[in-house]
């Protein structure tokens, strides 16, 4: 390349870098606050995650304001449809949780396509597990498997709903353990399920580790195993399913998304802000206090995980469509 061409190319690159820096520093349009739609009730895991991380994101972008609104219903479908059909102008963002995000349009008609959203940042990865009462006869996964085989179709388990990460985890577990289907009792979240478990109305709960970790530490519940690759540092005494000889990896991945077609300039700015927020020491400290197992992924990495989830569920749906149970 000639010296003149090198000079022009270098000048163009410098101008592009300057424009990017100015865009990152420019105030966010402040005609109204950014609405962050949480498709689940207040106080749940997705809601808590959103309210914890979003103030740190807005702090990175001058002029940006936000308000979190809860639009729950139909296991997240109502809120996800609102996010999907919002104008891609940066004034509407939302939260979601995989794999329920992918499962909804597979099992029923929905006004959104799971992979068409703009994926901004995943925040939490909370593994599924089996919670039992402290007086349960099941001391480990092997005990539960033996009981399921000895009493086919009699054991009862609770989840946070049909098509939830908990329910899909159970389908994978039954397949891996080669046990007859157990009796599924869906609830509208972990909050109403846990008292029923404590009261002896279900044999065990298939939920996330973080859902009842405080009760485990109080000695009111036990965890048989966690469906993670490694033991979570907040539950180091709980073996993984792989340690029990079962290849079961499942959990809830909670993150932030935008409507389809969010402009690249907006997406890049938000992704950069999330990258900083997810390293913030105050955020890390509070997440630990609230038993939030972090799994930070930004932009394309988050979308790639969502695509893997989509592919896995398509296979599961063909093998065992869960809307029937």
Language model: regions and residue ranges:
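Residue-level signal for nonpolar/aromatic packing positions in well-ordered secondary structure
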Residues: 34, 43, 50, 68, ...
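Hinge/capping helix and adjacent helix->loop/strand transition within the periplasmic-binding protein
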Residues: 85-91, 105-192, 241, 253-286
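C-terminal lobe and pocket-closing loops
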Residues: 125, 211-279, 308-311, 324
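An extracytoplasmic/periplasmic, membrane-proximal ligand-sensing/linker region
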Residues: 31-33, 264-325
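Ligand-binding pocket segment of bilobal, Venus flytrap-like solute-binding proteins
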Residues: 72, 154, 158-162, 166-238
């Amino acid at each position: 390349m000639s010296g003149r061409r090198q000079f022009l190319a270098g000048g163009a690159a410098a101008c592009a870098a300057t424009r990017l820096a100015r865009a990152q520093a420019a105030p966010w349009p402040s005609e109204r606050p950014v609405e962050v739609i949480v498709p689940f009730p207040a106080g749940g895991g997705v809601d808590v995650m959103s309210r914890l991380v979003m103030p740190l994101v807005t702090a990175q972008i001058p002029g940006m304001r936000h308000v979190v609104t809860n639009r729950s219903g139909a296991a997240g479908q109502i809120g996800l449809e609102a996010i999907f059909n919002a104008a891609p102008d940066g004034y509407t963002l939302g939260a979601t949780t995989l794999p329920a995000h992918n499962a909804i349009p597979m099992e029923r008609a929905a006004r959104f396509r799971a992979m068409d959203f703009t994926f901004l940042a995943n925040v939490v990865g909370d593994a599924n597990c089996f919670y039992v009462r402290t007086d349960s006869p099941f001391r480990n996964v092997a005990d539960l498997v033996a009981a399921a085989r000895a009493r086919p179709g009699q054991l009862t388990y609770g989840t946070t709903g049909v098509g939830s990460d908990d329910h899909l985890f159970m389908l994978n577990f039954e397949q891996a353990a080669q046990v007859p289907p157990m009796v599924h009792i869906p609830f509208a979240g972990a909050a109403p399920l846990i008292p029923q478990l404590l009261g002896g109305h279900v044999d065990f709960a298939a939920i996330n580790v973080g859902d009842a970790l405080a009760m485990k530490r109080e000695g009111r519940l036990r965890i048989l195993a966690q469906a993670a690759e490694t033991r979570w540092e907040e539950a180091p005494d709980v073996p993984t399913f792989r340690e029990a000889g079962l290849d079961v990896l499942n959990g809830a991945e909670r993150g932030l998304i935008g409507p389809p077609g969010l402009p690249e300039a907006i997406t890049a700015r938000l992704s950069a802000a999330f990258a900083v927020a997810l390293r913030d020491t105050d955020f890390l400290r509070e997440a630990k206090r609230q038993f939030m197992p972090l799994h930070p992924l930004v932009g394309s990495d988050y979308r790639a995980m969502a695509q893997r989830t989509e592919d896995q569920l398509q296979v599961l749906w063909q093998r065992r469509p869960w809307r029937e149970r």
